[in-house]
Amino acid sequence: MSYITFKSKLIEQKVKQYLKKKHADLLVKEGRRVLVKEEGALLITKMLIHNDDLQSEDLADLQMFPNIKELQLLSENITDLESLPPLEKLQKLYLNVKATDYTPLVKCKKLKKVEVYDSGVSDIAPFCELTKLKELKLSCNKLISLEGIQRLQNLTELWLDRNQITDIFPLAWLPNLEYLQLERNQISDLSPLRALKKLITLRLYHNEVKDLSPLKHLFLEELDLEQNKIEDLSDLVGIETLRNLKICFNPIKDASPLLKMPYLEFVCTDAEDIYLPLERYLGKIVVREVFGGQYPNFQEADTYIFSKKE
């Protein structure tokens, strides 16, 4: 009978915990030791390790689990991904580590969902090799350039918030995008988004946007424009699919375009000269002040939510 030889104590512990609950017959006790039969490795399809004791070299043990489909690794002591084996069935990957080179991820060719959060990613190139990706989340990193991302033609969901991005031109070549998160960058030009006809949700909170004309022919349902430099909302009037709109903290000079958008179900604004006309002329809109609470992201006392009456 063959047993698994572990090098990583953490991975060994995770495997034994799983098998003890569901496949205890694959654990064999010899004296004070508990051994894992080799066939037990084939039953591991998901592994989640959130522990700073996990080291870079521990990743080599993952080669014994060829059926892993989902992997989550959170550790400040993973600084190198070179030991990550080519997991041929891996489809979902979440990393919160301190690596500097993400090139080893290209060994996992079947990845469909990848999230690398707050991990110092400065080069998007390795992710552009993962052409089967449908969801890519690179929030809170150090990205400046998006060049190469146009190769990811299957992407439907993309998170790039809290980076250092100014130019989004490569996004023009991602026709299947439905959800785009670009909060807290330095983006001013939205023209590359004109071609994204499948885009439903767009989040642009805390950027440098002034011109909304590139959005006028899209079919957006949810749009977050808070904390930009927007003065004119008239380009939004023709987006009849739009239901949720956030426009707080913009120097908006004229609220009248909103009165031509009766299809809106939710509007967030901080300006009295905007919410009063809405309240007066659109009877289906109800106003509620927000002081945190139900909407904890809104801390300012002069923020108002408008939502469609039942």
State where each predicted segment sits:
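LRR flanking "cap" motifs
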Residues: 2-64, 296-303
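Short glycine-/acidic-enriched loop or helix-start segments at secondary-structure transitions
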Residues: 257, 278-279
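Extreme N-terminus of proteins, especially the signal/transit-peptide cleavage junction
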Residues: 1-2, 95
